[in-house]
């Protein structure tokens, strides 16, 4: 070979392997770049050899010409490690070519490379020694073996010779066919070109310089893209793998100026026999293509088949891939490398085997938990439906309570108890289901980060149960109300007619008690009302023996009435309002009340009573104070009222004083029958005794002891009877006593009593 300088530019670019997508059969370009259609894997290396003296150049050229190029395995490993750490970076270095070289292709670098890169930064670099791993002495150490395992693909793919890549470039790049067809180192790729390849390898320095020139020209991006368009079949790869086991000095170095490895004795020498190396290239290409295609296949299988079958098939495929290249390995250095590769693939297989298993366990447990959670949601939906049904029943029952008669009270209670029992059971089921759901939700949060929805997020079921409970409370209240109103209630007050008043005993106001000196009369207000059927007790028993029929007289009961009003005003008001036939005209705070209703005018007595009314109105007196008792002389504002047979004789009475009268029936007077025995004593024995100190008995006449102005002679034919009584506590009606003396009043009273006695 000539002593001409040998320069070679290589650029190396790599991306991670092996699972980047589908891999088409690998194409070998003239710049040692192994690429796929999607540019996922590119390995481009340009090797620069720097020689300081002609002897080293000659040694290096001779080694290249004889195809006996060697490279330390340890250094290759180190270079490959650096390439993996600094991926997608390009490094070029160029040896200074002497000026006396005549060939332009030998002394120039590609314009494209010079456009992007310059030689000076690489010539002034520190070198690779400051960045790389130790030298050849540690090539067989454990750390380097681990590195070999991780980047074995890079080591094997970069072992193609320059001559082989030159011919492949001529075939794959149509643009370079016309240029390279005339050169002796670019024959067509056929089976007969194996001998031509050997001749080209042994040609000499000129062929090497031409090859380097061609390699340099194809470094541009456009040439790179053109080189990807074609695809060499596996058979051509096999034929061109003549020197695939040749390791170049400094191959795979990145970014640094490479030292001269020509003086270093190679540790591994590869024979020239091309047939031995053919199975290696085939095995590697097939293995990597399968590894690249494996992720998509595994993913499809995982989605379509059970996990257990998927794991077994995946493991079998990996074993098949492992055994296939191992059976084709025939060289000692490559056997060691492939053993490392086998170890890495087996570890990957074990990892992939474990990960689907763990994924299976996790997915199975999570699916079980999610199944339980879905069951909890279904149970919540069932609870809501049950709540709605129970609410419908409660509403129907509430309507039935209003419609049914009160005699079905016991049935209502039974139905209410059943509804309450259903409500309690529904609440218990709701709480139990909610607790289960919460427990499952906590388990999911421990294993996974999946967010699980709440059992009752909007608390709809809980709200419905609460409304149902309130509705049942209302129904219960209605049932209780119906229980109290179920028994027929007695009327509080019944209308008091005149017949009832006639049949009852005479009131205490019609009775004139015989009082002895020093014995004050008992309070009239302590007794009950005869109209309401309440018995009178205590001091009220004494008047039973007294006269009950003093027809023309209405006695002045001032002190009794006063005491009654003062002591029991509430009872007076109650009893007055209890009689529907009574028209209470006086209140406890009012001491003057006069009321009368005339019976049918067919009665002569009633006619005379009506004639007497205007006289009373004209001669009314106001008040005459006598001690603490007051006698009221006033007009009768209600005496002019129209005769009303429905209401009968209305009167004002306290709790212990009641007046009753007769009703004229068929123009006749009816004699009231007293329940008490009447005393036939002369009226002279009747006295008004007042225990009030300072009271003058002579003033009794002025207070008007009797208020019957009409003559009793006219009513002799009709038995003495009580007409409409006029009595209020402490009140009375009296004629004008200013013009008449009290004597005629007493005379009338005595005359009336005598008539009664004679009858």
UniProtKB/Swiss-Prot annotation:
UniProt entry keywords in alphabetical sequence: Coiled coil
Biased composition (Low complexity): 497-509
Comp. bias (Basic and acidic residues): 679-688
The organism's place on the tree of life at top rank: Eukaryota
Ranges in coiled-coil conformation: 371-482
Pfam families per record: AKNA
Compositionally biased region (Polar residues): 181-192, 484-496, 639-654, 735-744
Ranges where the record places region Disordered: 169-246, 484-543, 634-654, 678-723, 735-759
Keyword Coiled coil on entry: yes
Keyword Transcription: no
Sequence similarity: Belongs to the AKNA family.
Protein name, entry field: Protein AKNAD1
Organism of provenance: Macaca fascicularis
Lineage, top ranks: Eukaryota, Metazoa, Chordata, Craniata, Vertebrata
GN (gene name): AKNAD1
């Amino acid at each position: 070979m000539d002593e001409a300088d040998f320069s070679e530019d290589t650029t190396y670019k790599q991306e991670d392997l092996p699972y980047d997508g589908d891999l088409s059969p690998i194409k070998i370009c003239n710049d040692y770049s192994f690429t796929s259609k999607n540019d996922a894997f590119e390995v481009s290396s340009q090797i620069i050899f720097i020689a300081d003296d002609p002897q080293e150049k000659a040694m290096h050229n001779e080694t290249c010409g004889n195809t006996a190029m060697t490279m330390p395995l340890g250094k290759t490993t180190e270079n490959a490690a650096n390439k993996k750490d600094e991926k997608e970076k390009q490094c070029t270095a160029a040896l200074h070519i002497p000026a006396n070289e005549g060939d332009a292709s030998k002394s120039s670098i590609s314009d494209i490379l010079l456009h992007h890169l310059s030689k000076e930064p690489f010539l002034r670099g520190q070198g690779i020694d400051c960045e790389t791993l130790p030298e050849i002495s540690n090539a067989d150490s454990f750390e380097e073996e681990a590195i070999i395992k991780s980047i074995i693909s890079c080591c094997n793919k970069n072992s193609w010779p320059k001559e082989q890549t030159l011919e492949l470039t001529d075939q794959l790049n149509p643009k370079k066919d016309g240029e390279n067809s005339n050169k002796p180192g670019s024959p067509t790729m056929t089976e007969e070109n194996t001998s031509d390849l050997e001749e080209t390898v042994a040609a000499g320095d000129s062929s090497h310089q031409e090859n380097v020139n061609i390699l340099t020209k194809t470094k541009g991006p456009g040439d790179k893209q053109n080189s990807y368009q074609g695809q060499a079949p596996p058979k051509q790869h096999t034929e061109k793998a003549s020197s695939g086991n040749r390791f170049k000095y400094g191959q795979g170095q990145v970014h640094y100026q490479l030292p001269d490895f020509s003086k270093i004795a190679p540790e591994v020498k590869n024979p020239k026999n091309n047939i031995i190396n053919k199975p290696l290239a085939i095995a590697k290409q097939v293995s990597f293509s399968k590894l690249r295609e494996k992720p998509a296949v595994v993913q499809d299988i995982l989605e379509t088949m059970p996990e257990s079958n998927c794991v077994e098939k995946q493991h079998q495929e990996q074993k098949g891939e492992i055994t296939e290249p191992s059976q084709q390995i025939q060289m000692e250095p490559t056997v060691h490398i492939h053993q490392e590769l086998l170890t890495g693939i087996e570890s990957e297989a074990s990892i992939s085997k474990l990960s689907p298993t763990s994924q299976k366990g996790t997915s199975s447990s999570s699916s079980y938990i999610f199944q339980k959670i879905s069951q909890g949601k279904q149970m919540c939906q069932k609870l809501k439906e049950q709540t709605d049904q129970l609410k419908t029943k409660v509403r129907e029952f509430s309507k039935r309570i209003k419609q049914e008669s009160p005699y079905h009270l016991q049935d209502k209670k039974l139905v209410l108890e059943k509804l309450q029992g259903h409500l309690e059971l529904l609440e218990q089921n709701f709480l139990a289901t909610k607790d289960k759901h919460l427990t499952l939700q906590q388990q999911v949060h421990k294993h996974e980060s999946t967010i699980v929805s709440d059992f009752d997020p909007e608390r709809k079921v809980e709200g419905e149960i609460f409304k149902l409970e309130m509705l049942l409370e209302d129904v219960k209240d209605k049932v209780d109300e119906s229980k109290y109103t179920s028994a027929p209630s007695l009327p509080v007050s019944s209308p008091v007619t005149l017949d009832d008043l006639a049949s009852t005993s005479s009131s205490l106001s019609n009775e004139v008690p015989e009082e002895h000196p020093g014995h004050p009369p008992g309070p009239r207000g302590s007794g009950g009302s005869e109209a309401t059927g309440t018995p009178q007790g205590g001091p009220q028993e004494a008047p039973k023996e007294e006269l009950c029929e003093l027809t023309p007289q209405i006695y002045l009961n001032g002190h009794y009435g006063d005491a009654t009003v003062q002591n029991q005003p509430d009872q007076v008001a109650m009893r007055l309002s209890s009689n529907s036939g009574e028209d209470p005209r006086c209140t406890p705070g009012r001491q003057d009340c006069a009321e009368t209703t005339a019976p049918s005018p067919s009665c002569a007595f009633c006619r005379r009573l009506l004639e007497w009314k205007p006289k009373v109105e004209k001669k009314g007196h106001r008040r005459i104070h006598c001690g603490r008792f007051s006698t009221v002389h006033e007009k009768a504002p209600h005496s002019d009222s129209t005769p009303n047979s429905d209401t009968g004789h209305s009167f004002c009475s306290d709790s212990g004083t009641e007046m009753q009268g007769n009703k004229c029936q068929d123009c006749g007077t009816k004699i009231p029958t007293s329940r008490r025995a009447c005393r036939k004593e002369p009226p002279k024995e009747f006295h008004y005794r007042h225990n009030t100190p300072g009271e003058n008995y002579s003033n009794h006449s002025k207070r008007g002891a009797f208020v019957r102005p009409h003559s009793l002679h006219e009513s002799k034919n009709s038995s003495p009877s009580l007409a409409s009584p006029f009595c209020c506590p402490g009140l009375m009606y009296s004629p004008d006593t200013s013009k008449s003396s009290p004597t005629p009043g007493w005379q009338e009273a005595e005359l009336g009593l005598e008539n009664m006695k004679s009858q």
